[in-house]
Amino acid sequence: MRAAALAATMTELADAGYASLTLDGVARRAGVHKTTLYRRWGTREAIVLEAMLEYASERVPIPDTGSLHDDLLALASSAAATATTPQGEAMVRAVAAAGGHDAALAAANHRFWTERLALDGEIVKRAVARGDARPDVDPVEVIEAVLGPIYFRLLVTGNRPGRAFIERIVDLAAGGATASCEPRT
C-alpha cells in the first residue's frame, strides 16, 4: 500500500500539479481508500514529502566511488536526469510555485532539503576523511554549489543542464573543496 500510494502521489503531482493534488485523487490512483492515506500521513503535505524523499532516494543514490569529483559528478548527473523527468519537473515546479505561498509546503520542502542535503553531504565527509578535501569545508555548501546551478537552470532560465554544464559545475565545486587554504595575496 505504501509504495502504491507514494507512486500515485508522484504521478498525481506530475499530472495535476501540487495545487490540484488531493488525497482523494491519490487514493483513487493507488486503489486504496482515502481514510487509509489520512491514517498513515494525515495531510497532503506529509504524503508529498515522503513521496519526494522516496522518489529522490530511488533515482538519486548517494554515490561512493572513492573520488570526490566522481561522486559529485554522479550525484549531479542523476539529480539533473531525475529533475527532468515528468515527476521530477512536477516536484521542482510545485515546490517553487507553492513554497512561497503555502506554509505547509514550504515546511515540507525545508524538511526534504534538510534531510537530502545531510545525506548528500556524506560524499564530502568521506572525502575529508580520506584526506581528499579540506577539513574546514562545509559538506552542505559543497552539495549546494553542485545542485544549485542545476535547479537555477531548470527554474529560472528554463534550460536543461547538459553534460558539459554539469561537468563544469562539478569541477568548480570539487576544486573549491580541495583547494589549498593558503591565504591569497
Where are these regions (language model features)?
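Helix-turn-helix
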Residues: 4, 8, 12-46, 50
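Short loop-to-helix capping motifs
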Residues: 16, 43, 98-105
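Tryptophan-centric aromatic hotspots in well-structured domains and transmembrane helices
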Residues: 40-41, 147, 151-152
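Short, basic, alpha-helical segments at the C-terminal edge of helix-turn-helix-like DNA-binding modules
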Residues: 52-58
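Hydrophobic alpha-helical connector segments
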Residues: 60-89, 142
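C-terminal peripheral helix-coil segments that are non-catalytic and often amphipathic
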Residues: 74, 118, 122, 126-129, ...
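Helix-loop "lid/cap" segments that line or gate small-molecule binding pockets
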Residues: 77-83, 91-101, 170-176
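Amphipathic alpha-helical packing segments from all-alpha helical-bundle domains
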Residues: 86-90, 103-129, 140
